Amino acid sequence: MKKVLLLLAVALLSLATSFKAQAIEDPNPKGTFVLGAQVGFLPGVGASVFGDYVLVDKWWKGHFTVGGELFFRHYGRTYAELDGYSYKYSYNDFAFAARATYGLNITSKFEVHAGVVTGVGFSRWGWKNVEGNHSHESQVGVCYGGLAGVRYFFTPSFGVTAEVQYSGYGPYTNVGVVFKM
């Protein structure tokens, strides 16, 4: 009996979700361009600017986008040892990446999205101790990873966004604004 009730509840929920999703007009038709700016945290602080172009719309209650992103991150730390010896280190990362996302339209104003990023990243790090010794190094590498986030639009062309992203070079958590053109 419990299995039958659970099956019935799941069927009704999926039917209600299907009817609600069909009633939502696609807020991101093909050809829409979304421009965003974000501030990032963890680790350190950073910023990113991205652009997404809607390539395919009305696909399984959502849309596919392709675009690009520039991001920067800085973080550092000071360590003090028990014997009084201390040192500082810092990292600066910059990357340019292509991104592709799938956005699921929950309502006409609210979207959940996930995607992938890949590109090239540049890092510079260094350390310095109290005696004046220091070292700096740089590297160039491939960045790749994934992202997941949400967007909420207050008007048809302005909204806010939050993303969790890992690419090896940029901030992991981002919040910002988006403009739909």
Q: For the regions a protein language model found, what residue spans apply to each?
A:
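Mid-chain, well-packed structural core segment of small domains
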Residues: L104-N105, K109-K128, E137
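Repeated loop/turn-to-beta-strand initiation elements of outer-membrane beta-barrel proteins
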Residues: K58-K61, S108-F110, Y152-V160
